Amino acid sequence: MHFRMKVLENSSKHNTPKKQKTFQHYLPAGDRCYSCIHCRANLAAHAELISKSFQGSQGKAYLFNAVVNVGCGPAEERVLLTGLHAVADIYCEICKTTLGWKYEHAFESSQKYKEGKFIIELAHMVKDNGWDEQNDS
């Protein structure tokens, strides 16, 4: 028996990257969270907040354990207030605004707790869902 095979060529003649559709993640309604000040996309649940005692390039910043709707750029070494770290800028996946950075690696043992954590500057986020004036912690 003799079989014939037809080879299908890639219909695209150019190697242009395909656009990926961005799906927005919504945190549970009623749960306190932080959102992008520019487009109001949810960024982090209040339960993921580790510390309010951080300094970003544009002022006060918060450290979070986990974030949503955030993209990450390439890591680079930077000397920060607490020493040398490998960090990657993070940005809002919806409006593409740079929000802060992700700690990829800490070179000093006392700073290892930051690895894999995220800094978001207050200049780029607002409180959303379930906040009241009396309980603002």
From Swiss-Prot:
Keywords: Metal-binding, Zinc. Zn(2+) binds at C36, C39, C92, C95. Residues 1-20 are annotated as: Disordered. Transmembrane segments: none annotated. It comes from the Eukaryota. Residues 32-129 form the Yippee domain. GO terms for molecular function: metal ion binding. PROSITE patterns: YIPPEE (PS51792). InterPro entries: Yippee, Yippee/Mis18/Cereblon, Yippee_fam. Belongs to the yippee family. This is Protein yippee-like F37A8.5.
